[in-house]
């Protein structure tokens, strides 16, 4: 039985400016998450720790963070740590990956395919790493093929599986599922896409490759539990994968309807009903929407203060007042003319995108009108 821990897309020292004064605290969270992963590597006595890229930012990465990684990897020796650099941490001459000395149990993959043999485990690990931030060709096009005489074959890669779940990341190092099948390895440890996803071998009907997702949420799009993958590969080639939660905090993104709210207290009571089960240590992003009483305009500072118990609480107000727009447009007033103009723009829109922009503009106009009413 062969076992491994697979992670990717840690993004240490990433420039997450939206965190403002919480930035260094979140960087500490990411380091503690890596320590949690290290503890799993040791406690589960795995054979390998596989890291599929975007570990430490090339731009903005700090030497102190690189030293932290060096010490962390040394603490799991002699367990091999196999790293395939990604587009955010390419294998460049001036990167910490090359300018620092690393423990002997750290195995780097470069833009030239690497092949590391572990005869005592009857295993070969193949890998390829970015040499620059932008790669538009499939690295598998130059894969040299498997070595004979070994029972287990693993691969570590950072890139995009074409036709995978849509993601906002650039399709760097694009690969097809068929290329992975043709490589004929037992498992491909992938990185680049921050949303967890597994790919099943079309013939063998077992996991062939996977993205574990980022182990600590980086933006408000990376919500919920964040995990690493624990893999076990038996002598017959049967692979099982287990997702293990490791994040220090969770990110929550909610849309809360303020329908009918006439006071701050009514709105807060409705919000508490939805936010009450979220841990104080977590990050919460709320969008308020829906029609509210025209005489009530939510105060963002008040709401931020009321929910300051959360590690981070950010709120956006997209509500609109319960104003009779048709009645206003019939009046000869500035407000009525404004709404009539927006209604005309919406009616003449040439695409759904233009119509949506007009609708949002109308909501903004109604919000401003409501704010002036008594």
Language-model-detected regions and their locations in the chain:
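Glycine-rich phosphate-binding loop signature in dinucleotide/nucleotide-binding domains
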Residues: 43-45, 147-149, 277-279
